[in-house]
């Protein structure tokens, strides 16, 4: 039994830095955490929560990591070796003083200002822990950052970050049983590679950018293929390649997502992930979501309207991407390790070049040219595929995208 358990791993309930603080507080030596008798008294600033000036000297009330607030201490500026926390505290303090119309050179802070600074500091800690958790959970290269400079909202409740779709009750997915025999799917494709076997042409160029029209299905190489993981026909399965930031919008659209790196036109950005459920189940959930004024239901009606992706409680960063009537992302149906046309994977590609710092959006009510749809054996219902695409939506939702050609309503 001991031999079988030797290489087992279990999730840790605390972050390593929290465990380090706990060991120091309890005076426990732990070599694995680099806690020794020599650094028992190394204290780490968790956040700054008050400020005062006395005889020209600045003092900050410090909340120490791993210690209760009752053990907070006032420290002179020279004792603090946390420039990032100091910069953020001064920025928050200035904003709060301006908002309250109080002097910026105040020698002490009023109760409401102190309360705001404490709330803001603890909010940032919660958001940072959520950010760390998502980055520990995700499999992809691109990092996730979180920012909220608008209000006091913390991480969303009842949301679990996932790396692949979660199958709901009554949903079965059959694994692919055949793959291509190509050694080089670009220069020496055998029988047209995976797309050719299904009478389609390859969707990507040598730079892994999509080259087919929206509405044309994408068939990537799969786990049964002879080619390796660096094959140019493996794109969506490689996951997010760009650093992205979940941020709070300042115009009532809730959370949004912006890119921190430039994204070239036709590049893969992210996959829309969630819980795959039956249309009947989606109908029931849709009634509840309508009452809440939210929508995370994405119909998979490439050929038949049988299944829906619900990203309300399980999803990835796409959960936070907002709608726009003039979006910079385009939806494509992708097939990899499952070829059931009722269960495509939903991939979002850049419609144009996207600058660093720009918000990412897609059209919840996207359309496909009927000519293109017909030419690719696609059911014309795909013109309604997406978050809008079924009778689940029973109420009008106001659009707040703000673009010139805004349709005023999402649905």
From Swiss-Prot:
InterPro entries recorded: Chromo-like_dom_sf (IPR016197), Chromo/chromo_shadow_dom (IPR000953), Chromo_domain (IPR023780), Chromodomain_CS (IPR023779), H3-K9_MeTrfase_SUV39H1/2-like (IPR011381), H3K9_Histone-Lys_N-MTase (IPR050973), Post-SET_dom (IPR003616), Pre-SET_dom (IPR007728)
GO function terms (MF aspect): histone H3K9 methyltransferase activity; histone H3K9 monomethyltransferase activity; zinc ion binding
Domain Pre-SET: 178-239
Residue sites binding Zn(2+) 1 per the record: 180, 182, 185, 193-194
GO cellular component entries: chromosome, centromeric region; nucleus
Keywords, ordered alphabetically: Cell cycle, Centromere, Chromatin regulator, Chromosome, Differentiation, Metal-binding, Methyltransferase, Nucleus, Repressor, S-adenosyl-L-methionine, Transcription, Transcription regulation, Transferase, Zinc
Residue ranges annotated for the Chromo domain, each copy included: 43-101
Binding site for Zn(2+) 2: 180, 194, 221, 225
SET domain span: 242-365
Residues binding S-adenosyl-L-methionine: 253-255, 296, 322-323
Reaction equation(s) it catalyzes: N(6)-methyl-L-lysyl(9)-[histone H3] + S-adenosyl-L-methionine = N(6),N(6)-dimethyl-L-lysyl(9)-[histone H3] + S-adenosyl-L-homocysteine + H(+); N(6),N(6)-dimethyl-L-lysyl(9)-[histone H3] + S-adenosyl-L-methionine = N(6),N(6),N(6)-trimethyl-L-lysyl(9)-[histone H3] + S-adenosyl-L-homocysteine + H(+)
Enzyme Commission designation: 2.1.1.-, 2.1.1.366
Gene Ontology process terms (BP): cell differentiation; exocrine pancreas development; methylation; retina morphogenesis in camera-type eye
Transmembrane segments: none
Highest taxon of source: Eukaryota
SMART domains assigned: CHROMO, PreSET, SET
Subcellular location: Nucleus; Chromosome, Centromere
Binding site for Zn(2+) 4: 325, 399, 401, 406
Positions in coiled-coil regions: none
Positions annotated to bind Zn(2+) 3: 185, 221, 227, 231
Domain characteristics, as noted in the entry: Although the SET domain contains the active site of enzymatic activity, both pre-SET and post-SET domains are required for methyltransferase activity. The SET domain also participates in stable binding to heterochromatin.
PANTHER family: HISTONE-LYSINE N-METHYLTRANSFERASE SUV39H, HISTONE-LYSINE N-METHYLTRANSFERASE-RELATED
Function, as annotated: Histone methyltransferase that specifically trimethylates 'Lys-9' of histone H3 using monomethylated H3 'Lys-9' as substrate. H3 'Lys-9' trimethylation represents a specific tag for epigenetic transcriptional repression by recruiting HP1 (CBX1, CBX3 and/or CBX5) proteins to methylated histones. Mainly functions in heterochromatin regions, thereby playing a central role in the establishment of constitutive heterochromatin at pericentric and telomere regions. H3 'Lys-9' trimethylation is also required to direct DNA methylation at pericentric repeats.
Family indicated by similarity: Belongs to the class V-like SAM-binding methyltransferase superfamily. Histone-lysine methyltransferase family. Suvar3-9 subfamily.
UniProt-recorded name of the protein: Histone-lysine N-methyltransferase SUV39H1-A
Organism: Danio rerio (Zebrafish)
Biological classification of the source: Eukaryota, Metazoa, Chordata, Craniata, Vertebrata
Gene name as annotated: suv39h1a
